A protein has these predicted regions:
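Short helix-boundary/capping micro-motifs
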Residues: 11-27
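Hydrophobic/proline-rich hinge and linker segments of small-molecule sensing/allosteric domains
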Residues: 160-203, 270-278
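Alpha-helical linker/hinge and terminal dimerization helices associated
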Residues: 43-44, 64-91, 98
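Hydrophobic hinge/microswitch elements
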Residues: 218-261, 265
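A short LG(V/I)-centered, amphipathic sequence patch enriched
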Residues: 41-62
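A late-sequence structural motif
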Residues: 261-301
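Central regulatory/effector-binding core of bacterial HTH transcription factors
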Residues: 93-157
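Secondary-structure junction motif
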Residues: 194-218
Length: 301
């Protein structure tokens, strides 16, 4: 039988990245946290944490963390229901937090609008980890989140992968810059395009390379780049003429400050909702809301 206090200490150390911050969060002494972690590791017969500047979970620790979070969520559902029943449904349910990993474009364009009614109705809090869609599954694997919007189609261990649809991206630039990328006949010149900077969300963002590979046959092309890791600022940089970039087509509706560099040329990113196979009632509601929102806003695949 796992000790609840040891699990609490373990979860806090991973969440806060160290023994000291975990001790402060739990209002315990540092030695007390260390003793609980050592007892947990000794009891299970393996290391659960990698000690370093920022403490992180081992593979075994990641599996244990996912278990701990699943149990915590299910307990929160049960306690919330019991309290509501004891109060005769007279009082509001306690707020419950759900951790998810999502790419920034999805958060801005369809995820939040789609799940907002659910969050308000069931008093759910979101703890969102923003990462590139090709990397969000790392947070699920580590046990940090209960679900993620990902490009990974194969279900991870202990998880379910459900298709959501595709986000369609278009290569755009400010009208003046788009014109500079074309020849006198109006044809796009890839050499002219690559002479201008691309606006890229962060160093994990590979959409620009995907566009160049898909439509020009270029592999690992060299071109200047701006890195702008914020959605509003990213789009503003393109609209201001700082460079060209890939923007979801939903974000282009009604805009006149950006136009397609190569009209009709798109990149589709197929997305999946990866989540724990063993879900609490609240997590199940979120899964259904995510799927419904995706069906409304994403392209079918």
């Amino acid at each position: 039988m796992l000790d609840a206090r040891q699990l609490e200490a373990f979860s806090a150390v991973v969440e806060h990245g160290g023994f000291g911050p975990a001790a402060q969060a739990l209002t315990l002494t540092l030695p007390a946290v260390s003793v609980r972690i050592k007892a947990l590791e000794d009891g299970l017969g393996q290391r659960l944490l990698v000690r370093g500047k920022r403490v992180r979970a081992t593979a075994a620790g990641q599996a244990l963390l996912a278990h701990v979070k699943q149990v915590q969520m299910m307990e929160a559902d049960v306690l919330s229901g019991l309290k509501a029943g004891a109060a005769g449904d007279a009082g509001p349910r306690a707020w419950q937090s759900l951790s998810v990993a999502i790419n920034a474009d999805s958060v801005a364009s369809w995820f939040l609008p789609g799940v907002a009614p659910l969050l308000q109705r069931h008093r759910l809090l979101l703890d969102i980890v923003i990462d590139d869609q090709d990397h969000t599954h790392d947070a699920l694997k580590s046990g940090e989140v209960m679900g993620c919007v990902s490009t990974l189609s194969k279900a991870m261990r202990g998880c379910v992968a459900e298709p959501l649809g595709a986000m369609r991206y278009r290569c755009v630039a400010a009208p003046a810059l788009a014109q500079r990328c074309r020849t006198a006949t109006g044809k796009v010149s890839v050499h002219r395009l690559l002479s201008w900077p691309a606006v890229i969300f962060n160093r994990k963002d590979a959409l620009q390379d995907a566009f160049l590979a898909q439509h020009f046959g270029l592999q690992q092309p060299n071109y200047p780049r701006h890195f702008v890791p914020a959605i509003d600022a990213f789009e503003a940089a393109i609209a201001l003429g700082l460079g060209w970039g890939m923007v979801p087509e939903q974000q282009l509706v009604g805009r006149t400050d950006m136009e397609e560099v190569l009209p009709g040329a798109t990149v589709d990113v197929v997305l999946y909702w990866q989540h724990w196979a063993r879900e609490s009632a609240s997590a199940q509601r979120l899964t259904q809301a995510v799927k419904a929102a995706a069906a409304q806003h994403l392209r079918p695949t």
